[in-house]
Amino acid sequence: MNFLRRRLSDSSFVANLPNGYMPDLQRPESSSSSPASPATERRHPQPLAASFSSPGSSLFSSFSGAMKQTPQAPSGLMEPPTPVTPVVQRPRILLVIDDAHTDWSKYFHGKKVNGDIEIRVEQAEFSELNLAAYVTGGCMVDMQVVRNGTKIVRSFKPDFILVRQHAYSMALAEDYRSLVIGLQYGGLPAVNSLYSVYNFCSKPWVFSQLIKIFHSLGPEKFPLVEQTFFPNHKPMLTAPNFPVVIKLGHAHAGMGKIKVENQHDYQDITSVVAMAKTYATTEAFIDSKYDIRIQKIGSNYKAYMRTSISGNWKANTGSAMLEQVAMTERYRLWVDSCSEMFGGLDICAVKAVHSKDGRDYIIEVMDSSMPLIGEHVEEDKQLMADLVVSKMSQLLVPGATVPSPLRPWGPQTKPAKSPGQGQLGPLLGQPQPRPPPQGGPRQAQSPQPPRSRSPSQQRLSPQGQQPVSPQSGSPQQQRSPGSPQLSRASGGSSPNQASKPSASLSSHNRPPVQGRSTSQQGEEPQKSASPHPHLNKSQSLTNSLSTSDTSHRGTPSEDEAKAETIRNLRKSFASLFSD
């Protein structure tokens, strides 16, 4: 301490220190008394002691000051507010596939995605489009349209699609299914989905979905018309009842539908099917009183009734009277059930006929390409526009997309106890094997780290110590970790009574020690004959480790190595204060 006091009181030593270290040596002692006080000489060593501990306090004060100044720095930087430049996002391109009779741009005028992203509408028919789709580049659409006698050629990447036109019609020789495939290849979202648009390119395929609903709900809730499918003309021999309605291929607006009154006409139409080289369906003719149409646009429902005035069996041919009827729960069930097919239909309609005997028959379902009828056509178009904007807000804006839930973490299970974790056993009161007696034969065992025991379990074998009492000649008692009362009871029992429970507990509860076989563990209590008296005072964990290490070591070379280590530490400590 005298060396430290002289060294720390040296002015040259303080001058050579970096800035911020030991500033208290150069400050006057505030707690010292007046010069006339006789207690000054007695308190003279106190400034030295304070100066000795001043590096830690000065470092702590410097760190505290830095921590106090840290939150003030950002506030100072934030004082001059900088104007944030608004980020103008590019407008989203909406491709509406429809004819030129409806100008869809006016229905999207003023509408924005999430209220801040504009929508640019591009409208064209399937016949005016071409495209190229890429795996990573999306879909590039080429459009060539004629507006007011002017040909417009444009290329763009659409962000969303509204399909309002049929992609396939055999009657008009229109097949644009390849364009639907290209749009799907580019991963473009649409209303309705491109998956459903492609599936609606075959009416028998759609009718098969109605059959599933029919079997699910039953004929009372979902009255589906009886229909028969023929892949070609060969199986078309006769019909069970007449008159029948024959539908050839895939067509719209009543095209390809023929009413057959008798067997002779049926055979004639079979030859027409052979020339058409397509499939055909037959269904019983229903003498209808009126037609029913239930449409669904998003969450809006409407039901219409159409009655033929001209008397034609096709209600869409000639004169007809159309009126809106009440939306019943029966109609709602029909359209809701059909809207679930092909992954969901945002826009759909169900067509049915009401016979003169008062029964209903569902004959067809339509998708987003359905024609709009009635007095609320403008309202329906506005509903479609609102539905598209809602879908665009959900699918195109990253902030509106909801991520998928993360898989919850499973319950953490405790890992299996590795051999290296056996060192924690003494700290938890687990029994450990004692070392072999001095002078006895050493058992073959692998090198393992020193182990410690609790003070009540430690039994040491000092060098040259002889047995003191006959009780110490019994084998060491081993007990389970959760029975401290057993250790106290067995400590005062006879050797014979203590050896029996220890043998049973060691054979069932204690795992094998590293480097020892099971047979060696069973023979250990018999080979050990050297006494290990109890310690009369408790020891700290450091003393336990050192004494256990001494009992396991047994060679003087390790003592010399420890002494050499202590000497090296002393030299290192002395070099810190040397010149």
Curated annotation (Swiss-Prot):
Residues 1-28 are annotated as: A. It is a peripheral membrane protein. Residues 15-83, 401-566 are annotated as: Disordered. Disulfide bonds: none annotated. One of its GO terms (molecular function) is ATP binding. Residues 28-90 are annotated as: B. It is found in: Cytoplasmic vesicle, Secretory vesicle, Synaptic vesicle membrane. Keywords: ATP-binding, Calcium, Cytoplasmic vesicle, Membrane, Nucleotide-binding, Phosphoprotein, Synapse. Residues 531-579 are annotated as: E. InterPro entries: ATP_grasp_subdomain_1, PreATP-grasp_dom_sf, Synapsin, Synapsin_ATP-bd_dom, Synapsin_CS, Synapsin_P_site, Synapsin_pre-ATP-grasp_dom. Phosphorylation at Ser-9 dissociates synapsins from synaptic vesicles. The modification Phosphoserine is found at residues 9, 454, 461, 469, 474, 480, 483, 540. Residues 550-566 have a biased composition (Basic and acidic residues). Residues 30-39, 47-66, 418-431, 453-485, 536-549 have a biased composition (Low complexity). One of its GO terms (cellular component) is extrinsic component of synaptic vesicle membrane. Residues 486-529 have a biased composition (Polar residues). Residues 91-398 are annotated as: C. GO terms for biological process: neurotransmitter secretion; synaptic vesicle clustering; synaptic vesicle cycle. Residues 399-530 are annotated as: J. May be involved in the regulation of neurotransmitter release and synaptogenesis. Binds ATP with high affinity and ADP with a lower affinity. This is consistent with a catalytic role of the C-domain in which ADP would be dissociated by cellular ATP after bound ATP was hydrolyzed. The A region binds phospholipids with a preference for negatively charged species. Interacts with CAPON. Regulated by calcium. Calcium inhibits ATP binding to the C-domain. This is Synapsin-3. It comes from Mus musculus (Mouse).
